[in-house]
């Protein structure tokens, strides 16, 4: 398309944004942070904090729903008009009035909150046109390769019918969604939600470290960094990893706010520490926390795990497409950066599925799996489907908010 298209993956933890012709998006934390000195840091300014202790974080999303456009618009302005941090400025490239927009929205968004997004996009930012939808809806448009796509031409021809049927597992900051896609359309009657995501893992790790080592209940940024650097999913089972926990132990050096502000993982060997250095020796914590995806009872949660949630989702789909969905499961979201996650998921699902079903779990080739959604949105923005499906500013002004929600972006008619 000759006209510029801005693509925004508006995640509850991090915003990925950029133009449809870019190879990589820009990234900004979707939050406002208050440090212990009562100074406020917006979005990526949080990464420049010298003292992360006792930081309070406020996000525009609550329980997965975008509820605070007062804060979200501040973060968007920071992204659009901050040339110092991003070396890109929307005012240098025409402005929002000359841009089309592709943006993500939470699944099952409350209609009134969805109307708020339409109103802000068309009345405050004046975008030329807009298309919005959940990240899972864009995944079929992904033009990149998956890690296990090295198939022969014969195999590719054999499985070509699967590509119209996908089961998208979107595991992000707030929760994990299982979304069946049939002929490019989410099958809303079978969508299932697991209330375990990145926020939950960070909170559980906080409680575990506070009980066993130091009190870190007010050190959210520190514990989140420990989670990202140290945790992994047991490749076979929790019990086998527990027996070998001393072989996978991790020693994490806590920040001293002079040489380190976030801490780091101590390399085994000759690395010497100062006399006053404080360390955490993490053994079974590094794998027991992510294991809650498969066994929530570890955290005293009496709900189905991710495997049971996926099977329940599949069983609510038409019987004829169930084996096709199982054969084409696509993983997206930041939690799939945890090592061994998608491999373990495939192993556990294959055990639970009928013996004549072939279970295949695909993971994108991107090193950071959280970028998969933005890449899919970018490919959609460059397609003809975007031109025919978008809502223009003129249509919005003519028909109004209710028309957009009911006839174009609402999901209620699919239920």
Curated annotation (Swiss-Prot):
Classification via Pfam families: Actin
Subunit structure: Component of the SWR1 chromatin remodeling complex.
Keyword Cytoplasm: yes
Gene Ontology biological-process annotations: chromatin organization
CDD domains in the record: ASKHA_NBD_Arp6
GO cellular component: cytoplasm; cytoskeleton; nucleus
Keywords in alphabetical order: Activator, Chromatin regulator, Cytoplasm, Cytoskeleton, Nucleus, Transcription, Transcription regulation
Species this protein is from: Kluyveromyces lactis (strain ATCC 8585 / CBS 2359 / DSM 70799 / NBRC 1267 / NRRL Y-1140 / WM37)
Presence of the UniProt keyword Transcription in the record: yes
Family of this protein: Belongs to the actin family. ARP6 subfamily.
The protein's role, per its UniProt record: Component of the SWR1 complex which mediates the ATP-dependent exchange of histone H2A for the H2A variant HZT1 leading to transcriptional regulation of selected genes by chromatin remodeling. Involved in chromosome stability.
Compartments (UniProt record): Cytoplasm; Cytoplasm, Cytoskeleton; Nucleus
Gene name per UniProt: ARP6
InterPro entries for the chain: Actin (IPR004000), ATPase_NBD (IPR043129)
Name of the protein this chain belongs to: Actin-like protein ARP6
Cystine pairings recorded for this chain: none
């Amino acid at each position: 398309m000759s006209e510029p298209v801005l693509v925004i993956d508006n995640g509850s933890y991090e915003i990925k944004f950029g133009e449809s012709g870019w190879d990589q998006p820009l990234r900004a934390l979707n939050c406002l942070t208050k440090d212990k000195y009562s100074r406020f840091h917006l979005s990526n300014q949080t990464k420049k904090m010298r003292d992360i202790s006792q930081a309070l974080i406020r996000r525009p999303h609550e329980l997965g729903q975008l509820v605070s456009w007062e804060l979200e618009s501040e973060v968007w302005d920071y992204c659009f008009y901050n040339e110092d941090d991003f070396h890109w400025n929307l005012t240098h490239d025409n402005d929002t009035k000359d841009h089309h927009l592709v943006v993500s929205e939470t699944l099952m968004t409350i209609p009134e909150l969805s109307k708020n997004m339409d109103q802000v996009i068309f009345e405050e930012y004046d975008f030329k046109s807009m298309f919005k939808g959940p990240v899972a809806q864009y995944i079929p448009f992904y033009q990149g390769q998956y890690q296990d796509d090295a198939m022969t031409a014969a195999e590719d021809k054999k499985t070509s019918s699967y590509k119209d049927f996908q089961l998208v597992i979107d595991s992000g900051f707030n929760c994990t969604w299982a979304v069946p896609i049939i002929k490019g359309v989410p099958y809303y009657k079978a969508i299932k939600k697991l209330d375990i995501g990145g926020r939950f893992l960070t909170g559980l790790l906080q409680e575990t470290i506070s009980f066993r080592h130091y009190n870190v209940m007010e050190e959210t940024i520190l514990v989140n960094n420990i989670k990202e650097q140290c945790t992994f999913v047991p490749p076979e089972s929790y019990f086998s990893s527990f027996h070998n926990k001393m072989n996978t132990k991790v020693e994490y050096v806590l920040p001293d706010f002079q040489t380190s502000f976030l801490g780091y993982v101590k390399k085994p060997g000759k690395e010497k520490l100062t006399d006053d250095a404080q360390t955490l020796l993490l053994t079974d914590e590094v794998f027991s926390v992510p294991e809650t995806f498969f066994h929530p009872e570890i955290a005293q949660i009496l709900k189905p795990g991710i495997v049971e949630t996926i099977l329940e989702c599949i069983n609510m789909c038409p019987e004829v497409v169930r084996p096709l969905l199982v054969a084409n499961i696509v993983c997206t979201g930041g939690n799939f950066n945890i090592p061994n996650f998608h491999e373990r998921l495939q192993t556990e699902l294959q055990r639970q599925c009928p013996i004549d079903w072939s279970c295949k779990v695909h993971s994108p080739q991107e090193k950071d799996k959280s970028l998969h959604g933005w890449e899919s949105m970018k490919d959609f923005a460059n397609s003809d489907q975007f031109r025919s499906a978008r809502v223009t500013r003129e249509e919005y002004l003519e028909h109004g908010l209710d028309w957009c929600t009911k006839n174009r972006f609402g999901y209620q008619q699919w239920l």
